[in-house]
A protein has these predicted regions:
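Active-site loop segments of alpha/beta catalytic cores
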Residues: 1-31, 35, 40, 51, ...
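A short glycine/small-residue-enriched secondary-structure motif
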Residues: 58-76
Length: 318
């Protein structure tokens, strides 16, 4: 069973020769774009022996300048796959897949509606202030903010479809908005969920799988309960949310679950090889081999040795 077939079997809840693994990290800035990023992805895939080739996305919605009030959301224009930042991402995907030279399960990162909406202003103001600003503006002038979200969602939907057409097997959809401290359940249902669903649907309609990554901490996981019909694989911060693998399996009975290890601490980062192997085998023993992909809560530290990741991948082999 090659890596791609192993991942496809896991997604289909079929028997696997061993549990596949998927890990990723943000590459250093100097190798995060262009040809350097192509090489970095291929090196990571080969040196970690992961079953999934996750393609990172640092080609973000462009900066728009100052955001002084809700009306400034009108400054966000419409984008599509021909916009320069998307062209760069799609070209990188194609070059990575050409460079691997073997059957590969490639997963293209698509930032969700919430993340994509903060990217045009995050660098100027900082992550938490921008999250708070966006929530405040939504309450002050919902119409203007939601109009901007519509434009962004249309762009990300086009990107999701284009990623599949470029050769990706699926998308890794990085979702924000489930945190209890930023939105109420009602705000999430109106301002986040419809756009998440639109983008996930676009990937599905293009023939790709959807990996839903529910990011950050203090999550109200029930907000995502209705996403199950649009997700092939679900991943979240088991230790960060907090929400156990078993709870996730009950919430998404038809999806494959991905995770099992903490990403910034614990045995993967700090443990011995023996401790890491024991932890991986315990996760698989407790959860089972069917409908499971070994992974972490989120991206790993940029500086983690690739040998540590390979040790986790190989620990899943019978």
């Amino acid at each position: 069973m090659n890596k791609k077939d192993r991942v496809l079997a896991a997604i289909s809840h079929q028997q696997v020769d061993h549990v596949p693994a998927s890990f990723s990290l943000h590459f250093p800035r100097e190798i995060a774009s262009g040809e350097a990023a192509v090489k970095a992805h291929i090196d990571f895939y080969r040196e970690t022996d992961c079953d999934v080739l996750k393609i990172m996305n640092e080609n973000l919605v462009p900066e728009i300048g100052e955001m002084n009030g809700p009306d400034d959301w009108k400054k966000i224009p419409a984008y599509n796959r021909h916009s320069p930042f998307m062209v760069r991402q799609l070209d990188m995907i194609k070059h990575i897949l050409d460079g691997v030279g073997e059957p590969v399960y490639a997963l293209a990162t698509v930032h969700g509606i919430c993340a994509s909406a903060i990217h045009p202003i995050e660098e100027r103001y900082g992550y938490v202030p921008v999250r708070e600003m966006m929530a405040a503006h939504l309450r002050q002038n919902k119409t203007v903010v939601l109009d901007a979200f519509h434009r962004i969602a249309d762009a990300m939907s086009d990107l999701a479809a284009a990623c599949i057409e470029a050769g990706s097997s699926g998308i890794y959809y990085a979702a924000l908005g489930g945190e209890k401290h930023f939105y109420t359940d009602e705000e999430f249902a109106e301002a986040i969920e419809p756009f998440d669903r639109q983008i996930l649907s676009a990937a599905r309609e293009a023939g790709g799988h959807t990996f839903l990554h529910i990011c950050k901490e203090n999550l109200e996981m029930s907000r995502y309960a209705g996403y199950g019909d649009l997700c092939d694989v679900v991943n979240w911060g088991v230790y960060e949310a907090p929400y156990t693998l078993e709870e996730g399996r009950r919430l998404y009975p038809r999806a494959t679950i991905m995770g099992g290890l903490a990403n910034r601490s614990g045995v993967l980062v700090d443990g011995t090889d023996d401790e890491l192997k024991a932890a991986v085998q315990a996760v698989i023993r407790d959860f089972g081999e069917t409908g499971f992909i070994l992974g972490a809560d989120c991206t790993l530290p940029t500086e983690i040795p690739y040998g540590r990741i390979m040790a986790a991948v190989h620990a899943a082999v019978k």
